[in-house]
């Protein structure tokens, strides 16, 4: 999980001190892949923001030393920050052989899912809104200023465009909840399901697929309001 990176860093420091002593730079997964491809140690703005150590104030963008000092993160472990749209290096000879790419192919900073899903959905201009539903889910709107609504637990985060923010109302478990319902509730109806689908459920893979189909059919028969049933799906 990308959550709570600071405390994972501190955990390694406390429980694996010998490994901690060997640290050169602290990278996210995407940045590690950039390193493997190009040999460059960098971190994009959205990844830096995800560490909670990035100063987003205009004119102050960069690692925030006071916060790093407060939580015990060493500044020398933090990589230079780059824009998502910035060329950060080129594919090395060794990486080119592994990847089947031409040596010297440009490597860009890129972005994480929260940054690039909006781009893929076409939500790139101020006011554009998109809805995403995967394992997690959110409603996101491109805004000009960083905004926080502590009452509604909604905040604007750094995205792929360095000049705007993504105002996110996020749910940790969206379609993951559908999987939970399938595993914990729908299997109680397996007799009904098998009777209906018969040999179509011979393999586990088909059972997984067809159970979702069966769920959708059942859901289609439920009236608006679900007869008063409320599901609050903040699952772990």
Named regions from a protein language model:
Residues 29-30, 174-177, 182:
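Extended catalytic-interface subdomain
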Residues 4, 8, 115, 173-177:
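Catalytic-loop motifs flanking and including active-site residues across diverse enzymes
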Residues 1-3, 52-54, 162-174:
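A short glycine-threonine-serine/GTX helix/turn-capping micro-motif
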Residues 38-39, 43, 199-236:
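Conserved ATP-utilizing enzyme core subdomain
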Residues 15, 36, 40, 122, ...:
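Active-site catalytic microenvironments for nucleophilic, acid-base chemistry
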Residues 56-162, 172-173, 185, 189, ...:
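ATP-dependent carbohydrate kinase catalytic cores
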Residues 1-111, 232-235:
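Gly/Ser/Thr-rich active-site cleft segment
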